[in-house]
Curated annotation (Swiss-Prot):
NCBIfam families: menD
UniProt-listed Enzyme Commission number(s): 2.2.1.9
Cofactor(s) in the UniProt record: Mg(2+); Mn(2+); thiamine diphosphate
The reaction(s) this protein catalyses: isochorismate + 2-oxoglutarate + H(+) = 5-enolpyruvoyl-6-hydroxy-2-succinyl-cyclohex-3-ene-1-carboxylate + CO2
Gene behind the chain: menD
CDD domains in the record: TPP_PYR_MenD, TPP_SHCHC_synthase
Name recorded for this polypeptide: 2-succinyl-5-enolpyruvyl-6-hydroxy-3-cyclohexene-1-carboxylate synthase
Similarity annotation: Belongs to the TPP enzyme family. MenD subfamily.
Pathway in which this enzyme or protein is active: Quinol/quinone metabolism; 1,4-dihydroxy-2-naphthoate biosynthesis; 1,4-dihydroxy-2-naphthoate from chorismate: step 2/7; Quinol/quinone metabolism; menaquinone biosynthesis
Subunit details: Homodimer.
Cited PANTHER family: 2-SUCCINYL-5-ENOLPYRUVYL-6-HYDROXY-3-CYCLOHEXENE-1-CARBOXYLATE SYNTHASE, PROTEIN PHYLLO, CHLOROPLASTIC
InterPro entries per the UniProt record, alphabetical: MenaQ_synth_MenD (IPR004433), THDP-binding (IPR029061), Thiamin_PyroP_enz_TPP-bd_dom (IPR012001), TPP_enzyme_TPP-bd (IPR011766)
Length: 537
């Protein structure tokens, strides 16, 4: 006589098992988008939050929920986003793609209909296994939950009815710590010889800055690199690269994910320049430029040699960059000060100056992060300012949600700012819809409003021969009244059109989420950018 097969696990039991596994893996933040099929997971998350094991966030829209979880993770928390079946899962795709390309450990938990219903036309049923493509394989939720892989994880959870519990859950779970990436213990020593610059792309981290200082090399660091501190950081590097100094570079040591400037891209692609890659996380670890050597462990430089033997590198190399940087910076500041009205560069500079030690700044893609790149001051080492940008795929979507999540993941006493363009703001305006009882950070959103997209004015599409098509296809003026939009969500709003007004608004945060709209011109953007590029020596 054969033993009876065990009863299948109930939806409630499955959901509680998965929530317990998430907590044991170090997840401390759960973002839920409402739905019926994910109800068992939502109830389990609610009970885990009531037990003090996680913090629960609810959002109406899955795209917002996904980027909120991404921002929480970027701030150092471990977050999971929970959604129902069907198109709800597809709306998480932008956040998942960004996480995959940036190496962010986002956890996605999607509820699903039973597998037998796939391909039958059943309501809200599609094939969710592998929905995010080969970048993010789907885990079978019937087995052990595995969260040790770098980058996003997708757990797909088929759930049978009933979808509501019979009792409250009192979880007996020991919270775990997220797994941390470990740099291999090996050490590679670089020769000082060639004229070298250090390029720090997004999320390069402080070790890139340390290497530049040890070697005495110029540091060309993007704002979100985590490296733009200390005396070796060169503010106007992208202007200098197009001049004589850039032409004399013989070697580049690159860390992180550099994506901001064409001068850096051209430098890395030059056949006469040796490129040393310090390695990177995310699916972009294979570089789009030739790499001569890759270092996955620690890195240092050899000891200085005696200049008398004629083999020492050019000891004036760093000072040449510093001197040129000071001169170009002074000319840039003078040019901007002479401009009538407020410029987007001045907005970026004011935001950078308003960021205190220990503060958080989330920067949107497109023009604002490039303007910030020219204007951010050389911050002090150890001041622990954190600049975050979604540079994995460099999209404008989800920027407000990312900023809200990143701010929620930081201590409440930390000043949090975000800088973005008006199109980026409108793209994620739904992130301002936050229900009663939800955690709300102190966050100042600075919107550079030029009534459309100005970055294309600086690209080929902005050339004079396309003027009759430009606005409709690329400039995309929208004429949205941001004050009214903010009023609809009861978000405080200030409109400024001078540097003095902007600095006053930034110096007097109201608490909670607030929007400071800085109005700038768009019609002169291409001309202004050309005059800035002409400042290079």
């Amino acid at each position: 006589m054969t033993a009876p097969e065990p009863a299948p696990e109930s939806a409630t039991a499955t959901a509680r098992r998965i929530l317990a596994a998430l907590v044991e893996a170090g997840v401390t933040e759960i973002v839920v988008a409402p739905g019926s099929r994910n109800a068992p997971l939502s109830f389990a998350a609610y009970d885990a939050a009531a037990a003090g094991l996680v913090r629960l966030h609810t959002r109406l829209d899955e795209r917002t929920a996904g980027f909120l979880a991404l921002g929480l993770t970027r701030s150092g928390r471990r977050a999971a986003v929970v959604c129902t079946s069907g198109t709800a899962v597809a709306n998480l795709h932008p956040a998942v793609l960004e996480a995959a390309h940036a190496g962010v450990d986002l956890v996605v938990v999607s509820a699903d209909r039973p597998a037998r219903l796939r391909g039958t036309g059943a309501n809200q049923t599609t094939d969710q296994v592998g929905i995010f493509g080969p970048l993010v394989p789907t885990q079978d939720a019937s087995g052990p939950v595995e969260l040790l892989t770098a980058g996003p994880v997708h757990l797909n959870v088929p759930l049978e009815e009933p979808l509501v519990p019979d009792d409250r859950w009192l979880p007996d779970v020991v919270p775990g710590e997220p797994a941390h990436r470990v740099i291999p213990a090996s050490l590679t020593v670089l020769a000082r010889g060639p004229r070298t610059v250090v390029v720090a792309g997004d999320d390069a981290g402080p070790r890139v800055r340390v290497l530049a200082e040890q070697a005495g090399w110029p540091l060309l660091a993007e704002p979100s690199s985590g490296s733009r501190t200390g005396d070796n950081a060169i503010r106007t590097y992208r202007l200098l690269l197009d001049g004589d100094l850039g032409a004399r570079v013989e070697r580049v040591v690159v860390g992180g994910h550099p994506t901001l400037s064409r001068p850096v891209s051209r430098l890395l692609a030059r056949p006469d320049v040796e490129v040393v890659d310090l390695g990177a996380w995310g699916v972009w670890s294979e570089r789009p430029f030739p790499v001569h050597s890759r270092i996955l462990g620690g890195v240092g430089v050899d000891a200085p040699v005696d200049a008398a033997d004629g083999t020492a590198d050019d000891t004036d190399w760093l000072e040449e960059w510093r001197t040129a940087d000071r001169a170009v910076s002074a000319r840039l500041d003078a040019l901007l000060a002479a401009e009538p009205g407020l410029t987007p560069h001045e907005v970026a500079g004011a935001v950078a100056r308003a960021l205190p030690a220990g503060g958080l700044l989330v920067v949107g893609a497109s023009s604002p992060i490039r303007d910030l790149d020219l204007m951010v001051p050389r911050y002090d080492v150890g001041a622990r300012r954190k600049v975050v940008a979604n540079r994995g795929l460099a999209g404008i979507d989800g920027t407000i949600s990312t900023a809200v999540g990143a701010a929620l993941g930081r201590p409440r006493s930390t000043r949090a700012l975000t800088l973005m363009g008006d199109v980026t703001f409108l793209h994620d305006a739904g992130a301002l819809v936050i229900g009663p009882g939800e955690a709300v950070p102190d966050l100042t959103i600075v919107v550079v409003n030029d009534d459309g997209g100005s970055i294309f004015a600086m690209l080929e599409q902005g050339a004079a021969e396309y003027a009759d098509q430009y606005d409709r296809l690329f400039g995309t003026p929208h004429r949205v009244d941001l004050a009214s939009l903010c009023a609809a969500t009861r978000t405080p709003h200030w409109r400024v059109d001078s540097l003095a007004e902007l600095e006053h608004a930034l110096a007097s945060p109201a608490g909670g989420i607030e929007v400071v709209e800085a109005v700038v011109r768009r019609d002169n953007r291409r001309d202004l950018d050309e005059r800035i590029r002409a400042l290079r020596p």
